[in-house]
Amino acid sequence: MKVSLTKFISIAVLSLTFMSASALASHHNSQRLDIFETVVADPSLTTLVTAIKAARLEDTLKGKGPFTLFAPSNAAFVELSEGTLGDLLNVKNKQKLAAILTYHVVAGKMMAADVVKLNKVKTVQGDDIVIDSSDGFKINNATVIKTDIMTSNGVIHIIDRVILPEI
């Protein structure tokens, strides 16, 4: 009887240990990264990370939100005219870069299904972006190539071009 009770207690302790570890792992996985952390984790957005840091917008994109980010891919930055990216990353152009990046951000969490119902939406920068869902999903002249990347403080849609406001 004593051996059975010892085995029972050992099995119960092991079961509780595994259940606790499983619950902890599940809780950890359910916590999403914020917009900035999600962008940093995506290898197709490294140029955007560099631009966000140069404009010192990390804290904004880590903020409470919610925000919708139309994130230009690395390939999108390559499409800029020669020298443009280098000029924008220059510290003297920080305000211009910040204006361009905030033109890619909309206040509120807007899933793709919500965005395509609109004709335009106001950006954090202050100007509107035009939405065209007649042939795919476009904002201004950029095609949305990946949608609805959920974050703890909003959502990200990846686009194939950098969109430029009138500045």
Where are these regions (language model features)?
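Bacterial N-terminal signal peptides
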Residues: S10-S20
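Mature, structured domains of secreted/extracytosolic soluble proteins
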Residues: V3-T6, A21-I167
